């Protein structure tokens, strides 16, 4: 097995029993692929598929004018390069976008001869700006990173369901069908309690379904022929002869004696006809049965009956037979009649009854009835009626089933799936009604709307395409109106097209749609989870309030597609889900999951992705089925899922067709990071998965000792850890960047063979956490493509590291861990284990006001020099300044309105020229409760305003950094070129050269070394081919230099041009503060198993419980938090973590004793290769083994994959390996080595019982007490009620509500109560008086009238009731 550059530094020992045949796919693939397909920017115009932007243009163009003389055609589009890169957009508050330009052709036909083209104008037209996706699947909109969440919505198609008996009091099932298009009117069909079938369009008034059938051109005869089979009768003078159809009589009660053709009575009257009777009649060759007259009465005619002589209609189709009608028929000489065959069991007369309820006569009347329902009150003219009917379901402009919808309709109506148009067809309506009638007749099954075959995912690309199409259709309307003038006014395409509607539609979607969300950037996992989220909410989806239990519940088809664990707690539970680890979308937007093919009970290496619909056809076994070395299923019975319900049952191995690819395929990325998930209760697992997303990155990330093996995948796929895009040798490393000289075989001809990775340093995330990347390579390291070369936030050696590994004891400690509280050792704080850096952005803008411009300056009156000490001459704080609440960060003055001055003041001002009172101090200060260090300052200046020194120095630094990058590239390019030149020139004969090189001399290495490299080009080789190559290299180097100079110039232009600022803003300054947050009581912590708590006390290290060798515990947790919560995974993690720490200490002791690699190998082989997945340690060199051992000193990392993890026996074996008997005895371990005798840190006495002690990965969550704690003495008041505002953000007070008033009343504390309701709240005069009294030293209160009484009086007055208050 080949290990990557980073993997071999610290190999994670895996307990997995099953080898993976299918790697976890790239976790951001759904987002990135969807948007790539939408843009198709890299695809040449001729080869673009009709999807995304191309499909939108194709759908709207060509646009023709109303008179048909002019039309505009779409040729192609292209996206320009973005003006700023992602980082610049974030700094400047811009959108990372690209300009979309479409090439359109305006064709004008000749007026006299419309078939002849008069003029063609082709032009490229600006069509707005399209936001671009970053490499990590997010968007930068107005400087902030956002994510477009995928939407899980009901797939277009046809669906059949019933009301579950809830509508009618009798509990009768009322069946309904619904045809849902992607775009256009919904068509519903529904039965009422009287079994009449209705239809409605867009949930409007219902009408009998036969009106719709007539409107599509069917006559009542044709309608009946479609839905019924007929009984054929031949009328006799008395009674009639019925054509014998055996299956129609079975189960009926004979209303008369049934005789065969020989006259023998086969069935007596009032006897039920059974199978034997049918056989007897059949064997007797019975073709006709004589029936009495009353058997015909009440039957319904299937066809119109016309008098053959006169042509007069005697009876209409759907008429009931009566005695009179029968008489008339006989008189007219009608012999053969057809009636509808109906029964109460499986052939109901529903359509016949509906036809009776329908009073429309023909197609025209039916269409008018539909028009009146859709447009009540409007006169139904013939054209309007026809236009509306066509537009409802048959017009491609207003109705679109989409490929998905057509496929779903065809598959449900049992037709070939790919055929049919994207609008409704008459057969679709007919077949739908047929299936619905069959359902009512008890044939067939209704659909499950929560089945993932009926719900599809709309990804970013599709959502953006819909918005773009909406904007483009608005443009189409405007263009249509103006096209008529194109010829007369000689207009060009750009005169006709206004891109604003497109821009505004796109901007609205990306900026304020419910699915465009502020990216959760707390840590790499929260980023990746946010991008893999699937929401049922949003436009065209469900609403929280209306979503029932069924939609939220876990469905069997979620298996391997949607995670059953990870979903929010609260009102959104089950509506927001996460994609499972291996899930992907198919071309129709349905979720698929991979399964491994099984043939003849043997596993193959073929992996097929199946959608929920396809999976229903197969028998799929679980990944934990027992398999022998050859891949054969060896159990007699295997647990497998089969049938459309996907019920788990035991089947024989020969019936198995597929097997899961991995045990973890059922869960999402976050849930798969929880070790021993299989031992946790689902509710707690949900909390564990959710809380990992809230973990704050620590100062020094620490990989989890007990992981699941997915940590590396998440860290790399999130883009937090930097990967090498091409292999090569590390040429230069510092904290800011890594320079790699690319391998020759990976370098592209004509490109620079250098990759420069500028690392992100101390950057603020959306949640104010710190993003910082640290290089992991040194100069000379050889890296391959995909190797991790730098760690990011919460990653350690390329693995996700959300928390810290802590020595945890499960025991009570003086009540300080009551109710899930957590007791922490002072050592944890002293070692900065949970210290995190948070970056706050504070900004100030200088505006142009009516009274004059605001000014950013150091010159502020009435401020002491000490307060200005941290400002430079431009009035902006310097980097590195330590600031506290209230300190000035940026000095700013605002002009004040001129006040009316007295003559004396005017005189003084004239004499002393004092203008300070004209401006007021509006400087940016550090908000209350915040302190930190200034780590960055950015100054943005409007175009045309001169820059201050600070802004100029920032630009100079940026240019210096950029020049450094270019110089590095040039250095490596030239180095490579001169190496090649040296190989080429050595031992070549020359015609002359610098330093008096004689003709005919041969070039030596010494001569070339002595000569300045740039003078090599002055050598004149005798071989013309070598001379030509020398000249080519010279030109190539000069070309590169020229390119780099151009790039530098472009960068300089970009930096020195004015910044785009909001209207009225002259200058903007952003100051970034780094705030260090140490762990303190009140902070929330959690494990990965939903075991959360709040830090209650930080205890001195000497008071913590300690082991026999003196090692104190880091954290003490309450053991009572485990049994009732049923998250036993945390205990198993603790035991395995304890073994990991012990093994690390054994390796550390050996290294201390200067052990050689050969001595370490046997122990490493025991650890890695006794059970679980074997590791190829022999492939490592001795130096690599020693480096590996050095990284294992703090603990050997384990991987216990979800549902395929370590067993108890393996944990015990690892504990035995980590703690041989001598070490165990020395540390006070019990015989099982899972518990320890601990001593009380305060008394030194041993505790009565052994305690479970081990290592657990604990996280510090983003709920920090510093962000929540808040106190107010005085502050702002509400304008109307004059009561203090509420909330920390407003520096508000604590609400003293109704119940608190009751409490004071109950205690009789009348003065306290009076004070609370008046001077401490909204008694304006009283407040000022109290303040005055305190200043004077008088401690008395004069309570007045609270302002809220005045508000109440005013509100009552607004109702027209006058109230006066008298004071007594």
From Swiss-Prot:
It is an enzyme of class 2 (transferase). The keyword Flavoprotein does not apply. SUPFAM superfamilies: beta and beta-prime subunits of DNA dependent RNA-polymerase (SSF64484). GO terms for cellular component: DNA-directed RNA polymerase complex. Its EC number is 2.7.7.6. PANTHER family: DNA-DIRECTED RNA POLYMERASE I SUBUNIT 2 (PTHR20856). NCBIfam families: PRK00405.1 (NF001616), rpoB (TIGR02013). Belongs to the RNA polymerase beta chain family. DNA-dependent RNA polymerase catalyzes the transcription of DNA into RNA using the four ribonucleoside triphosphates as substrates. This is DNA-directed RNA polymerase subunit beta. It comes from Cupriavidus metallidurans (strain ATCC 43123 / DSM 2839 / NBRC 102507 / CH34).
